[in-house]
Structure formats: C-alpha cells, structure tokens
C-alpha cells in the first residue's frame, strides 16, 4: 500500500516564523518553516453590525516539502506574510499508515 503524496512545493509559496510559548508567559526565539501555504478565511460575526473578521486562516505545513517542518504548539505566535497571528488549533493529518502527512494550523 502506498502512502499519500506530499503537498507539491509549487502549492507551498509562503514562509512562516513560529514562536512557541514559554512557561513564564513570554515566547521563545522564532523558528522558520519554509514552503507553507496560508489561506485566509473570512467569517461574519452575528452582531448587530454583521462585522466580518478576515484576520484568520489556515496554514498548511507539509511533513516532507515544508523545510524545517515540526508540529507547532497551540498557543504559539506565528507570522506569515508580515502578519502576526495566534495559533488556535493544530490538526495533525496522517496517511493510511499513521505517518504525519501534513499539519493544518488554524490561526487568528
């Protein structure tokens, strides 16, 4: 049985810096992950003004083609395209053999 192919590098045009949280409430030195993909999301809030929130999105990190890839911790600060964001959730996506294929990192 073959595993799932990596996300092609041509689909991973962005770079991301990651600053993991430290126990004292500060953040560690930034670590760079190259060849990631950031897709913005826009949500409408259910307030009286129907305001839209376009600051968040999902970062895709491939286990093979993202240089410097590692499992980013929820609560970390990341920067993609000059925008600093907070990691809300990290989804580990595995292939059929249980190996990490990629991570989907929800940021806001």
Which residues does each PLM region occupy?
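Active-site-proximal polar cores
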Residues: 1-28
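Short, conserved turn/kink motifs that form compact alpha/beta structural patches or helix kinks used as
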Residues: 22-108
